[in-house]
C-alpha cells in the first residue's frame, strides 16, 4: 500500500465494512477475512519477509484490553486521546480501534532499538503493560474501517517511509 487513497479504499470496501461488523458480533471467520496489514518488517534469519525489499520505518503494536475488566469502557474511552496527545513524542503514524478488544498503533521505529525494545519503550511511554507475545516482526494486524470511529489517527508519513514531502497533507485526527 503506497498511498492514503489506496489504504482508505481497502479499509472502506463493502466486504471490509461487513466483516468488521460481523467480527464485532463474535464471528471469528469474518475476522479472518479482514484486510491485514504488516507495519513492522525487519530482516529475519533466511532473509526478509517475503515481498519486502527493506526494513520498515515503523512498528505496529497491539493494545488489547480484557472486556471483562471493570475499567474496560474507561480504557477504551480514554486511551485514544492519551495516545494522540503524545503523538510527537511517540512518533505516531496510525491509531485504530481493533476489530474486537482494543487498539492498534503504528509509530516511528527507533533504529537504535530492537523490535522488542521499540515495543517495550512504547508500552512504557503510553503506560500500558508490555505484551510479551507481540515481539514477532511478521505479525499482521486485522484492520477495521476508515470511519472516524475506527481510524482515529493517520499520518501520511506512514506511506512515505519516513520521508515526508512538501506535498504530504497533515495528519488527520
Kindly give the residue locations of the regions a language model identified.
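DNA replication initiation on ssDNA origins
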Residues: 1-57, 169-173
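A signal for specific C-terminal beta-sheet/loop modules enriched in small/flexible residues
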Residues: 14, 22, 26-27, 35, ...
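Modules that initiate DNA replication and primer synthesis
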Residues: 50, 54-90, 99-128, 147-149, ...
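Short, solvent-exposed coil/turn segments
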Residues: 54-56, 136, 163
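Hydrophobic residues at beta-strand termini and immediately following loops
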Residues: 61, 95, 143
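Short beta-strand
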Residues: 93-100, 131-136
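Flexible helix-coil linker/hinge segments at domain or subdomain boundaries
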Residues: 124-152
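Functionally critical loop-and-helix segments that line ligand-binding/catalytic clefts
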Residues: 154-169
